[in-house]
A protein has these predicted regions:
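Exported/extracytosolic protein signature
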Residues: 2-4, 22-299
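Bacterial N-terminal signal peptides that target proteins for export
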Residues: 1-11
């Protein structure tokens, strides 16, 4: 009886050992890396060590994980203060490649619908559209928008690397204090591998995994204006008009006249009239104003 149970027990032990073998993990491993694995069973029979039994599994290639983050440089929920009539006002963003392959990233910005609310801890409601908006990539790494920043897509962004991106818009001159324009930035993953050449947007590989090919897996999270696993991530921000709220009043009164120069002067022919111009910036205004000139024009 025992002679039949011993091989069975040995086989069961071997199965248990194989079942407990750890799986090869590919988290953080570069796309296209070849992974192989060998199982070795060391055993003895009757106290005598036997030749190890070795099994080699088929190798496989690590797939491409596509993911990224897009965050306003001022933090989630942040907005940028602007003044009415200003041009090339900038919202800086940070785009990070959280995937496992060098990628290009296509960039786009959009004005959000009127009535859109955004902001934290203070929430603002969109009531106008910024104009002439464009997206530009920081060219020299100084995190400031310069005339040399003309690239409109991110070229060859390595895994775990980040790049500063600017959404630049003009603010209409008619806007008043506390007006708000909500915008977003969307980054779409594209194929890399060719410097200074814009790649095509990546699409997920369909069907079962083939061990000897590299599949594309869209692993991005849902952004503010897109879905999860769609190869893109978006994030919102906006322009908040912060300007002076000036009022001007003009009063007139008799200063002196040739009949009664110093006693209750009247505005008779030959009299002098005094105009008083008063300027005020509202106590609730968001910023101060610099007085350049006051024109007093007779009509």
């Amino acid at each position: 009886m025992n002679r039949f149970f011993k091989p069975l027990a040995l086989a069961a032990a071997a199965v248990a050992m194989l079942a407990g073998a750890s799986a090869a993990m590919a988290a953080g491993t570069p796309s296209g890396t070849s992974i192989s694995n060998t199982a070795t069973v060391n055993f003895a029979v009757g106290g005598v060590t036997q030749t190890p039994v070795v099994a080699t599994s088929p190798g496989f290639l690590v797939d491409t994980k596509v993911s990224m983050t897009v965050v306003p440089a001022g933090g989630a929920g942040s907005v940028v203060n602007v003044i009415s009539g200003a041009v090339k006002q900038v919202i800086p963003y940070e785009v990070t490649n959280t995937g496992n392959l060098v990628n290009d990233f296509l960039l786009a910005t959009a004005n959000l619908a009127s009535g859109t609310t955004f902001g934290s801890p203070t929430s603002y409601t969109d009531n106008f559209e910024a104009s002439s908006c464009g997206v530009f990539v920081d060219s020299n790494g100084n995190n400031s928008y310069d005339a040399a920043d003309t690239a409109v897509y991110i070229d060859e962004l390595a895994p775990d690397a980040s790049r500063r991106v600017f959404v630049a818009c003009d603010i209409p001159a008619s806007r008043v204090n506390a007006d708000f324009s909500a915008v977003n930035l969307t980054a779409t993953a594209a194929s890399g591998g060719a410097a200074n050449s814009q790649g095509a947007a990546l699409a997920a590989t369909t069907g079962a995994k083939a061990l000897n090919t590299v599949a594309v897996v869209l692993a991005d999270v849902a952004g503010s204006d897109d879905l999860a696993n769609d190869g893109k991530v978006s994030a919102r921000s906006g322009f908040l008009v912060q300007t002076a709220a000036l009022t001007v009043t003009k009063a007139v009164g008799a200063y002196c006249d040739p009949v009664t120069p110093n006693i209750n002067p009247k505005l008779v022919p030959g009299a002098y009239a005094r105009y008083t111009i008063t300027l005020a910036n509202s106590a609730t205004a968001s910023t101060s104003a610099t007085l350049r000139a006051v024109a007093d024009t007779p009509v």
